[in-house]
């Protein structure tokens, strides 16, 4: 089963959402100790939970800044993949900028939204006349009490695979 099919099914089926979380935890080993969990996903929005567990805490017993960056980057990449076929397009993170607003002392949720029109205007149409495009995605992370913990701006480079010069 392709990732896009699983992403699509996860938006309407709790079993498929469980399966997506299961598959991603095992195929992205870096994220496994953090136990990131997709709470919901649709074509336009993703919510990913970052739990308040020992592996995710800093020396002050608050949510670790790097973990907040990870859940933010993960949410943007996942939703972009939900719109773009990974067999046709390559995504590479160019930069990530974090602003921290509040120390997290509970679990947190990253929220990212985009729509099909945005993908068409910012990615698909520009790639008709250019080898690569750069898109900025902004994610807000809030704790379980509704406090705004961080804002992340991730810049992605997106290319069609036939324009990639370095082969895997």
Regions found by a protein language model. Name each.
Residues 79-117:
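Hydrophobic beta-strand-centered segment that forms part of the acyl-chain substrate-binding groove
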Residues 1-33, 55:
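Alpha-helical membrane-targeting segments
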Residues 32-37, 94-99, 122-124:
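Short structured motifs
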Residues 55-76, 89:
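Hot-dog-fold acyl-thioester-processing enzymes
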Residues 33-62:
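Catalytic strand-loop segment that frames the active site of acyl-thioester-processing enzymes
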Residues 47-49, 97, 109-113, 136-138, ...:
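Beta-strand secondary-structure signal
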Residues 1-15, 104, 115-168:
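HotDog/MaoC-like acyl-thioester-processing domains
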Residues 32, 92, 108, 133-135, ...:
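Hydrophobic core residues within well-ordered beta-strands of beta-rich domains
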């Amino acid at each position: 089963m392709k990732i896009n099919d699983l992403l699509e099914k996860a938006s309407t089926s709790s079993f498929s959402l469980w399966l997506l979380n299961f598959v991603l935890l095992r195929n992205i080993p870096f994220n496994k100790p953090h136990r990131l969990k997709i709470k919901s996903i649709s074509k336009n929005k993703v919510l990913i939970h970052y739990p308040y567990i020992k592996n995710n805490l800093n020396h002050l017993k608050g949510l670790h800044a790097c973990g907040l960056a990870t859940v933010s980057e993960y949410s943007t990449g996942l939703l972009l993949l939900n719109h773009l076929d990974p067999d046709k397009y390559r995504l590479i993170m160019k930069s990530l900028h974090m602003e921290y607003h509040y120390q997290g002392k509970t679990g947190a949720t990253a929220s990212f939204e985009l729509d099909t029109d945005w993908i068409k205007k910012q990615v698909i149409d520009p790639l008709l006349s250019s080898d690569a495009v750069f898109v900025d995605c902004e994610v807000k992370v809030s704790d379980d009490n509704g406090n705004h913990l961080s804002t992340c701006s991730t810049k992605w480079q997106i290319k069609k695979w036939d324009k990639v010069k370095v082969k895997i």
